[in-house]
Amino acid sequence: MSDRLTIEQRHNNMAAIRGKDTKPEILVRKFLWARGFRYRLNHPRLPGKPDIVLRKYRTCILVNGCFWHGHEGCKYYVVPKSNTQFWQDKIRRNRERDHEVLHRLAEMGWHTIVIWECELKPAVREKTLESLAFTLNHIFLEDHHIRRYELPEAKPAMVAEPEPRHRD
């Protein structure tokens, strides 16, 4: 089946697809802000410029589109019928780059959370976002747990001086 759009129309359509401020990303950002989580966007010093960076939690959140990042088993990831080899190569390169970015962030000591576009569809959105908040709180508590200090067993010290013995 051939493309219904002209080459020029398809070019304009594809050029309009943005990589930042996507609807799924904005949903996650609004949820985080409403819950009191403060973050930075597309941090330039981190590998891959993660979508959302929470420094306090040492966590990066990547909001991935199912098509562009090749979400296996997802109904939104379907390779187009035209120019198939190009799309397979492009999505494979995206997945390899994603894997490399996750590996480099882990080496730097950063936690990473990947949220897929399909996990933000209305039927499962609330569950996904609540799970995100739970995960962030868990990460914070694990990284900042209270350390107990064990003291060696010793003879208890005396609080008061011994009474002097008087002679009668």
Feature-to-residue mapping (PLM):
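Nucleic-acid endo/exonuclease domains
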Residues: 1-114, 118-168
